[in-house]
């Protein structure tokens, strides 16, 4: 039996940020279809020259992507959501830490998220809930 649930979409996202999110949504979805090594290669190129994103910048980008896409706002949209948020940050001249990994407690499921200042952005779980398998950090920084 399934339980219906409503998705929460951020409502207070400015129009300009929503426009930027719509702009990066198609590239994010296309990127999400690539194998992990290609995603990493593309993101490594895109992150060059960007400053590390603050938690506020990363959250604003994530909120904007969730506001314009029900798929990204949903429970199975983590990969395009995290890619879209990273690309939107890049449009603003910053780069969050983009991560993929798995939950550390059963059932072990794959997940993708963004981090800033060493903390997952708006995931609603403790910092150690996921373990990183791959990360694309801002240039000059190394993963934990």
Kindly give the residue locations of the regions a language model identified.
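Helix-boundary/low-complexity linker signature
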Residues: 1-144
């Amino acid at each position: 039996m399934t339980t219906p649930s409503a998705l929460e979409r951020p409502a207070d996202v400015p129009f300009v940020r929503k426009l930027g999110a719509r702009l990066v949504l198609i590239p994010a979805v296309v990127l999400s279809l690539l194998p992990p090594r290609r995603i990493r290669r593309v993101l490594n190129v895109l992150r060059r020259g960007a400053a590390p994103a603050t938690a506020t910048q990363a959250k604003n980008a994530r909120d904007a992507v969730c506001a314009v896409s029900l798929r990204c706002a949903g429970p199975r949209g983590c990969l395009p959501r995290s890619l879209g948020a990273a690309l939107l940050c890049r449009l603003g001249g910053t780069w969050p830490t983009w991560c993929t990994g798995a939950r550390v407690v059963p059932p072990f499921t794959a997940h993708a998220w963004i981090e800033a200042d060493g903390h997952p952005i708006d995931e609603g779980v403790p910092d150690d809930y996921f373990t990183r398998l791959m990360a694309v950090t801002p240039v000059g920084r190394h993963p934990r």
